[in-house]
UniProtKB/Swiss-Prot annotation:
UniProt-recorded name of the protein: Nucleotide-binding protein BH2387
InterPro entries, per the entry: DUF520, UPF0234-like_C, UPF0234_N, YajQ-like_sf
Organism phylogeny: Bacteria, Bacillati, Bacillota, Bacilli, Bacillales
Keywords from the UniProt entry: Nucleotide-binding
PANTHER family the UniProt entry points to: UPF0234 PROTEIN YAJQ (PTHR30476:SF0)
Length: 164
């Protein structure tokens, strides 16, 4: 049985869960006493961006904490959030744009493939656009690669899909 087995390493964000987390965070902001009369809001401004608006930097930090807690509750990784600079907005408010990271970029992909190749397992790792395809003849080797990647402290979330 010389069949090749494979799986893909991807870094994706479930946008439906992001929307759910934002809605839960907005519900908490509207109900919290310390945000009464505040202009605080969270909204998704495109596929890969979330805009946070608040009265001042202190309240913006509270909004960020609320959003992070809702991400955790919805099973989303905080590593997907890349926080931009805090900037002044209209009406005396402050704004911060959060970029949602998805896909494994070139440098990160090279780092992961090198890690897999250095493990001396009988598998091949190939970079395909923004994902990595790992192939091997033995399923046990692929499972060892999955375990190896899970043990690494990466600065981006990784999911394992298309196990064949």
């Amino acid at each position: 049985m010389a069949k090749e087995h494979s799986f893909d390493l991807v870094s994706e964000v479930n946008l439906q869960e992001v929307d759910n987390a934002i809605n839960l965070a907005m519900k908490e902001i509207t109900n919290r006493y310390d945000f009464k009369g505040s202009k605080s809001s969270i909204e998704r401004t495109g596929d890969e961006q979330v805009t946070l608006i608040s009265d001042d930097e202190y309240k913006l930090e509270s909004v960020i904490d609320i959003l992070k807690s809702k991400f955790i509750k919805r099973g989303l990784s905080q590593k997907t959030m890349d926080f931009g600079k805090i900037e002044r907005a209209a009406g005396g408010t402050v704004r911060q744009v959060v970029t949602l990271l998805s896909g494994i970029e070139g440098e990160r992909a090279k780092k992961l493939t090198k890690l897999i190749r250095d493990s001396k397992l009988k598998v091949k790792a190939q970079i395909q656009n923004d994902q990595i395809r790992v192939t091997g003849k033995n399923i046990d080797d692929l499972q060892q690669v999955i375990q190896l990647v899970k043990e690494q402290d990466l600065d981006f979330p990784v999911q394992f899909v298309n196990m064949r």
